[in-house]
Amino acid sequence: MSDVVGDWDSFALLLIDVQKDFWTEVISIAFPDYGQNVASLLALCRNQGIDVVHLRAQFRKDQSDWLAHYRLGGDMPCVEETAGAEVFEYATESGGEPVIVKQTFDGFLSGELNEWLQANRKRYILVAGLVTSVCVLLTAAAAAQRGYLVSVVEDCCADKPEAHVHTLERYPFVFDVTAVDDIVTSRDDWLKKLAALET
């Protein structure tokens, strides 16, 4: 991991839903290094000065903010004050990093996330978290549709293996794919892309 802090003012990491209800047995078997990878990603971002925003699902016990499909089924992940809503220790916030609570697959839908990114002049978004084919994909797509450049950090996302691979391969017109060990070396190329958008 590099100790050289670069020009990361335009960048932010969105870490999505690293919560116990989304960590299934299938995913845990398929992605045994996931926790360490996320810990490494957060350490890199904090060391390099990349701002981190934590997005987390949380729903009321009375079902008043549940999505319609889940209300019909009578079951919802990440209900407040349940063990499933808890964040894994390796993914907790640090040093005043913002935490945005959401009740949607798309982390941008409430407007709070985009307001923060705009206020902090972010233009390039790194996306990681759970699960690849749902909240990671839909938040990455929402970012792209709002004019941000987006890279998904593939070794810090997880899902059923086939869904994970399909999602990362299917949408090159929405986002690029990177890995923790490639972030620092990719910075100059990403900055060139941002500069090209200004011309």
State each model region's role.
Residues 26-32, 71-77:
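Short glycine-enriched, charge-decorated loop/helix-capping segments at active-site entrances
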Residues 1-12, 40-48, 72-199:
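Active-site-adjacent betaalpha module
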Residues 19-24:
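Short acidic, Gly/Ser-rich segments with clustered Asp/Glu that frequently serve as metal-coordination loops
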